[in-house]
Every structure is written in structure tokens, then in C-alpha cells.
């Protein structure tokens, strides 16, 4: 039955009275209630809200992916205009018909690329499969198009990436592959569920620009789900604000930002970290927290100095970490990924040193190398006056009491078969620090310290939200009273309010226990808020390092300026200068085996502020 008359002119999607529920303990739990919206051709609708507000399940309902997961979906109308201009009722399509709709007419970019990509197929095969299915292309034509899409999403060495498997790529690289796959068939509607959360600011800016270009070329409608209000201001035409499963406010992006009506919308905007908000301040400052009663209430600032004078707790000198690449009939090592090249820095007790840079710049590898989670090929790592890069495995285990790691994905770093109490107790058992009764009391204290309840110790990881799981990982890292915590993108996937709570918790713990943080992040607004010093990494080397205030208020290196210029601004009407993005020819950190990369030479430009010298910088960036 044709539905053309039911869809208003210009609309590509229309939803009326969408209700979504799930069964839990024989009770129906409502996830979305009476949601209605429309999407015009060529328009971007941003759906914003905190975790659990119903954003993602709405997207899954549109793709008809909820029913097989036990979701109960009811809707008066769910109309889609296909690329052929045929209008269909999505709720009436059977499974076979939806397979032709997904990918060709509606595509979705998921938040977690590792769970969305098939681990047994190469990246090229997975992108080509969609192209062959929906465009009737040959295998050769599909692979050529797959490489073109990888080039479009700014993946260097695209031809090499085609033959790699998902686990061989970084998180940011996998997300770009997902985006390339979704855009490869040029759908009528693109649903993007937190597509740039795991990406650094420059790649995020380029992806947003790419989506805009393709949207204009094809008059594609885009539903953009995000918690980043800077991205909303950057890309959205209209905004739909969701809270506890309901739409509480909708309007143009200018109306939402300049005249928000609902208390939750005002609270959400008040909690957005603004780049430049720390201007003139020397020390870290707490985030404001979302409050419906007091939307603009500011959390108490931290202005006291937490850095302890004396010797650094951690010294790194000329650290080198490379990964071999094999090729040829004999599978010999012919090339190497120069992940970290002659990196040096100090970390003082009570200090937060942030490592920033693009995906693939060597930030995470540097953090992992400090704990010997990856082997280094050169350099020195000195902790409390003792070299740890040459320690035996037995002595290294004892050292790990003092240096702990918080990983980006809390769900992947917690054993799903263990209660969270057992996960927190495990480090205490491994190091033989506390007997069972004392360990249980320690777990209860740690859970309370990170804002959870002692009775939560008996629950499993899947019973917690993302923010709660990250708190559990922090509690586990604190169990051994470490002197240093390495936090690798610990808050990048969390929404605004949860992120603020976690950052405030880290600052409180630093104040109380004098912990030193190596904070690895691509979120420049968060880095500005939490850091004492900042080190900027580019292709495995530090090109600028100094006090946070100096680096943010007076950036000297062109790469640092590019990172700051790429940060989205949560102000839709602000006239921003044209962004300075990286050149189209992205340098590669893959070199022939035995080839040495010229090390940058840093010169002092201010108190504690060092920048790569122009001549070595030029040679390095051109290699």
C-alpha cells in the first residue's frame, strides 16, 4: 500500500508516537514514550540527552533492530522515503525487505566499532560487501570504491588498511572504517550514534565536514546522536532534547542554545566544558554538575596547588617503541610502525600531565610502555629513582602496586564472570596485602569513595551504566594505594554529567592522596580543566610540552594550534575563522626496518615551556 500522501513534502522520515519498552522480571519497562519527530531531506537533526535517555534505542527502533533483542516497539507512523522516492512504512517491512533498506536507504554508524565489525573478515572485505550487495558492483570495483572511502575518512596507508583485521587497528581507526562503510552506499538517511566520540578533535572536525559534504551532494537526511553540545552547534539544523525517554524540548539549534525553555536543556548547556574557560587560571578546576533545580550551579573550584616539590616520581628518557610488520613469502619483518620515538618527560607527585594528539600519535602506546604492557626497544623509565624498564617479571609485578592503569573501555577491562567486589579484591589478593575480611572492608570503603554503595560489590559489570563501570575501574586502580595512575581516554565515551563527576572524583582523589596522573585524552576542553602540564604528541614524538596555561593560551607549535582550532565550539551563531586542518597528505609512521626517524629538538620558549625547533620540526613533519 503506497504511503506517499502521508509524508509531508520535503520530509524523508516521519515518526509519530513511538513507544519502546523492554521486559524485565516480567514487568514492562518503558524506554521511550510518545516520541514524534520528522527529518527533512538535507537536514541534520541532533538528538541529545544523557546516557539512558532513550537516544540510541530510538535509532535502533528506526533500523528495526530492537525486536530481535526483545524490544517492544509500537508506533502510529514510521515512514521513510527511499532513494528511489518510494515511501514505505518501516514497521510493515519483513526481515528480507529490511535487509535491502539497511545500508542502501538507511545506514547507521554505531558507537562501538569493535562490536560492530566482523573480527574474521578484513576491513576491505567488509566495506566491499556492502557495496557489492547494494550497488551490484564486481569484487574489483567494490575494493576500489572501498579504498576511495578509506581515503575520504582520512585513513593513511589506505591500501594497507584494506587487508588488515579490526583488532589490528586503533579505536579511532576502527571508527573511521565504520563511517566509511556507512557512507559507501550513499543512503537517504544516515543515523550516526556518537560517531565521533572516540575520535580526536582534528579527525572529528574532518569527519563532520565529510558528512556535511556528502549530505549536500545527496540531499541526505542525518540523525546525529551525541552528548557533545559543541558538535551539536557545529552540525545540527534542529535539536531534539530527550530526558528519561521523553522529548522535553525541540527547536532550531539557535533556539535551543540561545533561548532554552526546559530546565534540563538549560542544565545540559551549563555543564558543557568550554575551551578557554580556564583562561588566567593556573590550577585545575572542578566541573559544574547537572542539576535541574540549579542549572547553572558551579561546583566548588579547586585552586590549591597539589604538586609536591622535590624529585619527580616518574622520569622517562628517550623512550622508543616500535611494532614489526611482516610481508613476503617468508613472512619476514620488512617494515616497522614507529609508535613512540625518543619521548622524554617527568611527572611529579600530585601532578596531572596530559598527553594529547591525534589517533595514532603514540599516546596510548606511551602509557602502556611505562607498565611494560608493550615492549620498548630503547630508552629509560625511572620510577622513584629505580629503572623499571630492565626489571624481571617478578620485580615488575611488585612495582605495579605503585603504577595503575585505567583503560578507555571499562566494560572490556572488567571480567564479566566476576562480581565487581571480586574484581576490586583481585589486586589485593595478587599482592597478598590484606586477608579476606580486611579486603572486604577495603572494597566497601573504595566503593563509597567513588560514589557507589557497598552492596554493589555483589553485582556484575553488565548491571551498571558506563559511568558506574568507570567508577569501578577507578576503585580497582586505587585499591593498592598507587603513586601514579595512567588514565587512557578514561572519560572520552561518557556523557557530559558523568564525565564531570568522574573528573571531579579524580581531582578529589589527587587532593586527598597526592596521586600523579598521566592523563591521555583527545578532549581538549577536559584536558584544559584537569591538567597542570600538557605534552602534545605528533607521529610518536613530543613536539610541545609545558604548563597548561602556556600551551593553551600561547601555543607555539603549528600542530598544537591545529588541535585547538579543530575543537567544536558550543555556540552556533559564533563566527569562527576557517579551521586550519591537517594537510590531505597525512604522513605515515610506518618505515622500512632499520630506517631511523630524525628526533625533534626542543627549545625553551618560556618557564617550563618547550617546543620543537623549526628546522627539526620541518624535517620531521615532511618525512
UniProtKB/Swiss-Prot annotation:
<keyword id="KW-0378">Hydrolase</keyword>
<dbReference type="GO" id="GO:0005886">
    <property type="term" value="C:plasma membrane"/>
</dbReference>
<dbReference type="InterPro" id="IPR017871">
    <property type="entry name" value="ABC_transporter-like_CS"/>
</dbReference>
<feature type="binding site">
    <location>
        <begin position="49"/>
        <end position="56"/>
    </location>
    <ligand>
        <name>ATP</name>
    </ligand>
</feature>
<dbReference type="GO" id="GO:0005524">
    <property type="term" value="F:ATP binding"/>
</dbReference>
<keyword id="KW-0547">Nucleotide-binding</keyword>
<feature type="domain" description="ABC transporter 2">
    <location>
        <begin position="314"/>
        <end position="564"/>
    </location>
</feature>
<keyword id="KW-1003">Cell membrane</keyword>
<dbReference type="InterPro" id="IPR013563">
    <property type="entry name" value="Oligopep_ABC_C"/>
</dbReference>
<dbReference type="GO" id="GO:0055052">
    <property type="term" value="C:ATP-binding cassette (ABC) transporter complex, substrate-binding subunit-containing"/>
</dbReference>
<keyword id="KW-0677">Repeat</keyword>
<dbReference type="InterPro" id="IPR003593">
    <property type="entry name" value="AAA+_ATPase"/>
</dbReference>
<dbReference type="Pfam" id="PF00005">
    <property type="entry name" value="ABC_tran"/>
</dbReference>
<dbReference type="InterPro" id="IPR027417">
    <property type="entry name" value="P-loop_NTPase"/>
</dbReference>
<comment type="similarity">
    <text>Belongs to the ABC transporter superfamily. Glutathione importer (TC 3.A.1.5.11) family.</text>
</comment>
<dbReference type="GO" id="GO:0034775">
    <property type="term" value="P:glutathione transmembrane transport"/>
</dbReference>
<keyword id="KW-0997">Cell inner membrane</keyword>
<dbReference type="GO" id="GO:0042626">
    <property type="term" value="F:ATPase-coupled transmembrane transporter activity"/>
</dbReference>
<feature type="binding site">
    <location>
        <begin position="357"/>
        <end position="364"/>
    </location>
    <ligand>
        <name>ATP</name>
    </ligand>
</feature>
<dbReference type="GO" id="GO:0016020">
    <property type="term" value="C:membrane"/>
</dbReference>
<keyword id="KW-1278">Translocase</keyword>
<comment type="subunit">
    <text>The complex is composed of two ATP-binding proteins (GsiA), two transmembrane proteins (GsiC and GsiD) and a solute-binding protein (GsiB).</text>
</comment>
<comment type="function">
    <text>Part of the ABC transporter complex GsiABCD involved in glutathione import. Responsible for energy coupling to the transport system.</text>
</comment>
<protein>
    <recommendedName>
        <fullName>Glutathione import ATP-binding protein GsiA</fullName>
        <ecNumber>7.4.2.10</ecNumber>
    </recommendedName>
</protein>
<keyword id="KW-0813">Transport</keyword>
<dbReference type="GO" id="GO:0016887">
    <property type="term" value="F:ATP hydrolysis activity"/>
</dbReference>
<dbReference type="InterPro" id="IPR050319">
    <property type="entry name" value="ABC_transp_ATP-bind"/>
</dbReference>
<keyword id="KW-0067">ATP-binding</keyword>
<keyword id="KW-0472">Membrane</keyword>
<feature type="domain" description="ABC transporter 1">
    <location>
        <begin position="15"/>
        <end position="269"/>
    </location>
</feature>
<dbReference type="InterPro" id="IPR003439">
    <property type="entry name" value="ABC_transporter-like_ATP-bd"/>
</dbReference>
<dbReference type="Pfam" id="PF08352">
    <property type="entry name" value="oligo_HPY"/>
</dbReference>
<dbReference type="GO" id="GO:0034634">
    <property type="term" value="F:glutathione transmembrane transporter activity"/>
</dbReference>
